[in-house]
Regions:
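Blade/loop signatures of beta-propeller domains
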Residues: 1-24, 157
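Asp-box/WD-like beta-propeller blade repeats and closely related beta-sheet repeat scaffolds
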Residues: 75-89, 93-177
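Beta-propeller domains
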Residues: 15-19, 49-77
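Signature of short aromatic-glycine-proline-rich micro-motifs recurring in repeat-based ectodomains
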Residues: 35-45, 129-137
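Repetitive beta-architecture junctions, highlighting loop-to-beta-strand starts
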Residues: 21, 60-62, 70, 101-103, ...
């Protein structure tokens, strides 16, 4: 398995016993899979891709289901991916995510990655699985500003990246976000 590898569709259909509703299961590998954080879209606006994280390689990596064919495309191959950080751009041109070493933008056509910001040192994450501790990021509705929780010097900050101007600034110097 590796970045750019295309896997056959794993779609399974089930019928809910109580409602009779048809339910589509996107993945069937025997491992952990999860969607992005609850306020992060799992699709681009054109619904070309369904984005999810799979641990099928033994560590979390980002995949996209190609909606037209159902095939699964592995998008990342990073040993220190922050699994809750993924955020697709609304236009579907890019996928944004972080690793312990930086903030990345992946071109969905070429699968070329660009490091937008290199983290000079690994940000200290807050203990737990809530808020900034999960590394969840968010993107403005116009696909211009990406917000990333970071921690350094024992303090929490929000890093804002202007994706058009390629500039950054930090805000919120607190003990926790």
């Amino acid at each position: 398995m590796g970045k750019g590898q295309l896997h056959p569709s794993e779609t399974l259909w089930h019928t809910d016993a109580h409602t009779g509703a048809r339910v589509r299961q996107v993945t069937s590998a025997a491992c952990i899979h999860h969607h992005p954080f609850f306020f992060v879209p799992a699709h681009d606006q054109a619904m070309r891709y369904t984005f999810f994280v799979s641990h099928r390689s033994g560590q979390p990596q980002i995949y996209a289901e190609l909606r037209a064919s159902g095939q699964l495309l592995q998008l990342t191959d990073h040993p220190h991916l922050v699994p809750w950080s993924l955020h697709p751009t609304h236009d579907g041109r890019h996928l944004l995510f972080t690793t312990q070493s930086g903030a990345h933008r992946l071109d969905m056509e070429t699968l070329q990655e660009e490091v937008l910001v290199a983290f000079e040192q690994q940000p200290n994450q807050v203990e737990g699985m809530v808020g900034a501790a999960m590394g969840t990021t968010t993107l403005s509705g116009d696909d211009r500003t990406w917000a990333i929780p970071v921690r350094h010097g024992g303090r929490s900050h929000m890093l804002f990246i202007d994706l058009q101007q390629q500039t950054t600034h930090e805000a919120f110097d607190n003990t926790i976000i």
